[in-house]
Amino acid sequence: MSLKILLTGSSGFLGLKLTEILSKSSNQVTGIDIKEPIKKYDNINYIKISINDYIRENKEDLNTYDLIIHTASVLPFKGKKDELYETNVDTSLNLIKEVSKLKDTFFIYVSSSGVYGKPLEIPVRTSTTFNPLDFYAETKITTEKNIENYLNINNYAIIRPRTIMGMNRKGIFQIFFTLIKYNIPIPLPNKGKQIIQFVDVADLAKLILYIGKNRIQGKWPAGASNPRPLREHLDMLGLKLDKRVLKFNINPTIFKIIGNIFISLKITSFTKWHFGAFPYDFYFDSEWKPKDFQYEFSNEETFLNSALTFFSKQ
C-alpha cells in the first residue's frame, strides 16, 4: 500500500538514508529541512523550510499525510542550549499539537538512547528509568512527555536509537578512527571492557519504516544484535586493517573529570553524557523489538562497515 509521508530533517544523516530508501518505493514523500540535502533522490519532494513555517503555510494539508516521521533535531555538539530547546522542544511541540488534531495520521518520533544516560540496569528494558546526563537528553524526554500528553497512544511510536553508525557519520568513533590512522593511542576508560551497542543507519531507517507502515504503536529501542566489548571491536578492526590499534587505559572517574573540565573550558563539543556513560555497558534487551522485525547487520558488522568505509576513503 502506498503512503503519503512527511519527513522532517530530511537533509540529516538519518533523513538522507530514509529518503534514499523511500525514493525506491511507490510512496508519496515530502522531505522538509532548513538545509539543502547533500544528495537529492528521485521521487522525493524536497522543501527547504523550517518546521514552523511549513506548519503555518500547509496547516490544512497535514491531514492528508498517512505518516509523519519527525527526525529533525539539534544535536548536543552542534547547537547552544537555547537552540537545542527551541528546536527539540518548542518546534516539536508545535508539530505535536497540529498532529493531535489529525484523525488517521501515524506519528513517529526519533528520540535518543541518551535519555537513559548511564543506564541504571543492563540490559536496558521497557521498565528502565530515565537517567539523563545532559541537556540534550532532557529535551528528548520533554518531547516524549509532550507526545504522551497530546497524542492518542495508538497513533504514535517513539524510537530510541543506540549509537548510529554508517558512511560519513561523525562523532566519537570518527575520532577513534582518526587516532588509529595516525597510530595515536586511544584512551579507553574501563580498559575497553564496556559492552557497547550500535545500530546501522540503514537498519534504523528500515525499523522506522517498518513501524510506520504497520502502525506499530509504542516505544522501541534501535540496536544491532550481539553487542560486544569495545576492546573486541577495536581488536577485530586491527585484524581487518592489518594494523596494531594502540590503546591506553584510563580510570572512568578520571575520564569523567577530564571531560567535565574540557566541557567547562569549552574546548570539546562533547557533553557530560559522552564522558559519563561511555565507560560503561549500554545495550538493550534483545527481546525488546517489534514482532517479525529483523536487523540486517550485527553489532560487529555495523562497527566494521562504518570503520572500513572511513579507512577506504583515506
Question: For each predicted feature, which ranges?
Answer:
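NAD(P)H-binding glycine-rich loop region in Rossmannoid oxidoreductase-like domains
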Residues: I51-T87, V115
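Flexible, glycine-rich beta-alpha linker
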Residues: G117, I159-I175
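N-terminal Rossmann NAD(P)H-binding glycine-rich loop of SDR-like oxidoreductase domains
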Residues: I5-S25
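Substrate-positioning beta->alpha
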Residues: R169-I175, P189-G212, G218-P221
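Conserved Rossmann-fold NAD(P)-dependent oxidoreductase catalytic core, especially the SDR/UDP-sugar
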Residues: N94-F135
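Active-site Tyr-X1-5-Lys
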Residues: N131-A157
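Mid/C-terminal beta-alpha module of Rossmann-like enzyme folds, strongest
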Residues: I211-F270, N299-Q314
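NAD(P)-cofactor binding segment of oxidoreductase domains
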Residues: I68, G79-I108
